[in-house]
Amino acid sequence: VRGVRVVMIGGTSNTGKSTVAGALAERLGFEHRSTDLLARHPGRPWRTPEREVPAHVAEHYTTLAVDELIDSVLAHYERLWPRIEELVRTHATGPGLVLEGSALWPERVATLDVPHTAAVWLTADEDVVRARIRAAGRYDAATREERFLTDKFLARSVRYQSLMVEAVDRLGPARVDVGKDRSVSEVADAVLAQAS
């Protein structure tokens, strides 16, 4: 990635952005950051060993329709954009950065007039996204209510990817399909090839 100081990796939830970005950052000797850590928005609506689903997160997914969930998350990403842009500008002339997150919306990234940057979006077939989200949410052991929340998150994630792919294909940035069985190393190689 000659000359590139910031590699941005976008994509919907559970496409492997964090894992691939971590591997890529290690390979390049760059810092790895996630846009998810810049501000809070109702995230994944399933229990983990460390936490229960907060009431406001459950309410968010229970009460909003899929299009409203999309509008909500895109509005959140729009509010977050100035911080993302500042981070990209700072690292474009300084220490290298691999920045990943769903907040890297193609239409906003396309407006960046910052040298030494590259952007790639990860995509996956709906079956892959579904399997990964259901595995993360322990769907098979979940209650009916927990499955409902996971299904809403899945529907939002699939819709997000559909809109994102339309934007990426229209604007021309690169995208990499993570496939069903591609290794992290293979996806990282493909991202590097697209970012060069």
Where are these regions (language model features)?
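P-loop (Walker A) phosphate-binding loop of NTP-binding proteins
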Residues: 12
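Hydrophobic positions on the alpha1 helix immediately C-terminal to the Walker A/P-loop
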Residues: 20
